[in-house]
């Protein structure tokens, strides 16, 4: 038997909105410690890892480990029926091929039940190795989102370079080039508005902007975003979910073929 009750129901809605365009079908894994998901996008370029720890739920019962295959677009449609202030409860009986979503209004005067069929999804669980990153940038999530959006009106890819001067986002396209530099800024009154750069060695990597723009759909979940970079490793774009866990997006860097050819 599985029963999860989340008072902050809007949180689950935001999680689904942030991943439903990237991943079509995925398994939600429930264990005694939490509710998690790990899935690749359809083109196998990006990976998303979600964790909601059990202690973040008002009530969390998971008698045995269970994996629930769901179509994320359908799940998002169901969650759209919940009000932003609603309490959301997820229920699944052992061996059942359905999951029930229950939405309760805060005043308890309206309760809605939605039942959704589960799917059988074959998915290999990818071990994500713990890595030491050359550079870690923490910045306001809204600022990162704006940068990705602005640069995609110029080009398709972004070069993210971290030096001791700051972090630089650059792109080039048919109409010209654009460079945006964010310097370390820790003197702000509110910690969530700070830009903090930890760098062991300079790093410069190229990424597809359409994926980064997709990742920024998680902006409503957190005021800050952490970007971890290392040569030849996927970038990790992490949004912490208040007191509960995180959503992490991994994206492999693009190898610049043109540059490879012009090297002596």
Curated annotation (Swiss-Prot):
DNA-binding region listed in the record: 61-80
Chief location category: nucleus
GO biological process: leading strand elongation; mismatch repair; regulation of DNA replication; translesion synthesis
Domain of life from the UniProt record: Eukaryota
CDD domains reported in the protein's UniProt record: PCNA
Alphabetic keyword roster: DNA replication, DNA-binding, Nucleus
Cell location: Nucleus
GO cellular component: PCNA complex
GO function terms (MF aspect): DNA binding; DNA polymerase processivity factor activity
InterPro entries (UniProt xref): DNA_clamp_sf (IPR046938), Pr_cel_nuc_antig (IPR000730), Pr_cel_nuc_antig_C (IPR022649), Pr_cel_nuc_antig_CS (IPR022659), Pr_cel_nuc_antig_N (IPR022648)
Family stated for the protein in its record: Belongs to the PCNA family.
Described function: This protein is an auxiliary protein of DNA polymerase delta and is involved in the control of eukaryotic DNA replication by increasing the polymerase's processibility during elongation of the leading strand.
NCBIfam families the record matches: pcna
Name the UniProt record assigns to this protein: Proliferating cell nuclear antigen
Gene name of this polypeptide: PCNA
């Amino acid at each position: 038997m599985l029963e999860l009750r989340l008072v902050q129901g809007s949180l689950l809605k935001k999680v689904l909105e942030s991943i439903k365009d990237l991943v079509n079908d995925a398994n939600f894994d429930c264990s005694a410690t939490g509710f998690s998901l790990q899935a690749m996008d359809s083109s196998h370029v990006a990976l998303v890892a979600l964790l909601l720890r059990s202690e973040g739920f008002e009530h969390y019962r998971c008698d045995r480990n269970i994996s629930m295959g769901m179509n994320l677009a359908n799940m998002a449609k169901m969650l759209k029926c919940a009000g932003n202030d609603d309490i959301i409860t997820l229920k699944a009986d052992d061996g059942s091929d359905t999951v029930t979503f229950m939405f309760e209004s805060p005043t308890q005067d309206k309760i809605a039940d939605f039942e959704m069929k589960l799917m059988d999804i074959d998915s290999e669980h990818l071990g994500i190795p713990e890595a030491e990153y050359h550079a870690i940038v923490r910045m306001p999530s809204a600022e990162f989102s704006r940068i990705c959006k602005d640069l995609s009106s110029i080009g398709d890819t972004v070069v993210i370079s971290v030096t001791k001067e700051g972090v630089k986002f650059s792109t080039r396209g048919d109409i010209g080039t654009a460079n945006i530099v964010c310097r370390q800024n820790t003197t702000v009154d509110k910690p969530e508005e700070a830009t903090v750069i930890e760098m062991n060695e300079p790093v410069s990597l190229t990424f597809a902007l359409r994926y980064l723009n997709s990742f920024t759909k998680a902006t409503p979940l957190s005021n800050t975003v952490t970007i971890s970079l290392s040569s030849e490793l996927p970038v990790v774009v992490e949004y912490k979910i208040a007191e509960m866990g995180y959503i992490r997006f991994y994206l492999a860097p693009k190898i610049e073929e043109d540059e490879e050819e012009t090297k002596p």
